[in-house]
Amino acid sequence: NLPESSFPVNANSAVRISTKVSEPEDFFPVAEFRKQSAILIGCQNQIHLMPKLYGDIAKAIGNRVPLFGVVGSETQALRGAELIRSIGLPPHAMRFLVIPSNSIWIRDYAPFILRYDDDRALMVDAKYHTRRMREDRKQDDFMGFELARSLGLTVRSIPLVLEGGNFISNGDGLLLTSSKTLSVNKEGHFTHKQLITMFN
């Protein structure tokens, strides 16, 4: 008998590879203080309510890195483009992605974008929910798939509840989080030992 992880998989096969222990890969979350390839911010209807804030962000970044604003409709995207034009910046100073969402808290529900050593990227999309939601925030939960499709990136789903605002990476293998990450995932029927194993 071959170990489970040795079974071949092809497009015509219903067999899936299952590994007992996850194998390390060479990707890592980029540290926030390192040079970024792009910046993604939630705008939604706030682009209309607080235009000066978004204009100031675009000016401060000054085309040093691509800036993307996530909006929920074409109307919001057009308002954003008009804002950028009205403050004298070129159209590419801030581009707008139309991706439906339920809230502005994009740092919490956006996927983690990881970089391989050879500069390829992929997205890791965790579960996302608040204390009282699943239905109320369904668009937020699926935002990662829409973003991956828009940018043409691979996306991997993981069965953990992770909020991006609850993580920070040093970009070199150290990822810090709070005890909240463990407690919400224990509610999802993971044991403490399973969670510690996943994070080590």
Each language-model region and where it sits:
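The feature marks the mature, well-folded catalytic cores of soluble enzymes
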Residues: 2-200
